[in-house]
Amino acid sequence: MKKITGFFLLIFLNFSCEQDESYKQVLTDPETFQAAVKQLTDVIVYDIFSPPVASRIYSYPSIAAFEVIRHIDPSKYRTLAGQITDLTKAPEPVDEVNLHLASLHAYLTVGKALIFSEEKMQTYIDKLYERLEDKGLPRSVKKASLAYGTQVANHILEWSGGDMYKQTRTFPKYTIQDEPEKWKPTPPDYMEGIEPHWREIRPLVIDSAGQFEPIDPEAFSLEEGTEFHRQLMEVYEVGKSLDEEQTAIAEFWDCNPYVSHHRGHAMFATKKITPGGHWMGIVAIATRQAGNSFDETVEVYTKTSISLFDAFISCWDEKWRSIVIRPETVINQYLDEDWLPLLQTPPFPEYTSGHSVISRAAAITLTDYYGDDFAFNDTTEVEYGLPAREFESFLQASEEAAISRLYGGIHYMMAIENGVDQGEEVGKFVIANLKTRKEAQEATF
């Protein structure tokens, strides 16, 4: 009888130990971090942040998470402090800290501080920690890990406060200029220009907003035979004769966070991910497909989000320097007042194409990790009612994202082609000057 009792006691103790340790399986699972990123994306969509601002919201939480999780293997990872502008070293972890939990907490804490709907993030956080407690997370480990995560989050938030974002909220709005070549608000809502002072935001890796200034746009002209007129007519004619594939490409890469719809006197809007959010979705696909660990997943999100952040600064610097008029405005005024682009024209100047710049920068970064033949099925837009698209590489995806803006009727080819070149320069500069690994460690998968 004693032997039988002892046998069942042993089984019970083993089961209890497994239950007590199961929280570690949740925390080391990269899907736990993937879910946190998805939650942040969902709130960004809900709060309708503009593409440049969304890139800021993606980058700072990722940096916070990386600065924690890098301690999981000090022989492998290096700090971003000293590599990113003005960033100093974050506090070091102490005993009893679970680095996966601390990294998650740093990510969620910084993310919550940067969005409007804090209650949505807090609800997610509360449910996550409740789940971990149910899986046996010890109170002492939770307390130490959250305390450390908060320390790092506060360090990143204090540093982020010096990037001129708050100051630019009070800067004057763009004053519409009368010159025919200058950008004007576009239908249907004629919204004010978004982020005309984004060039003032402190870059993370590039030296300055104007470091990779593209060549000048073609001079405005309605005279036949001029390059501007040729490109204008190209947008007009392509828009009138789109085939099924071109339409699908344009819609897949629309990524407009706020599209208004007018029906008589009624107006409603649809919300979608930003262009940067789409590339965060591609990071999710790539890291899952490659079987990356939790720390590797954080690493790839971090470097890609940094490339996106700097690419938006570079692009917006040119947009609000050249202030090029959109095709829709010129076509409606001089060629065809009834012509409509397939996509709703975003409320900011035309040159260069944001999709072209940021997609190329992200693709260069991801190619550095996974190679130039990493085929994937892009399901990012499925939840928004669009079918998945297959790509042979990240660069191919970025090229399709770029040309989609011609099909959408919102960009001239000069903005697309020169935007790709601009994004390539940004991406190459980031991978050359930002190292997440120690010298002996190859950051490829």
Regions found by a protein language model. Give the residues of each.
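N-terminal hydrophobic targeting signals that begin at the initiator methionine
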Residues: 1-2, 18
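Sec-dependent signal peptide recognition
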Residues: 2-8
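A periodicity- and composition-biased signal for non-globular, repetitive helical segments
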Residues: 8-9, 361
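Enrichment for repetitive, rod-forming helical segments
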Residues: 9-10, 412
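C-terminal motif of bacterial Sec signal peptides marking the signal peptidase cleavage site
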Residues: 13-16
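Acidic/polar surface patches and capping/hinge elements
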Residues: 18-445
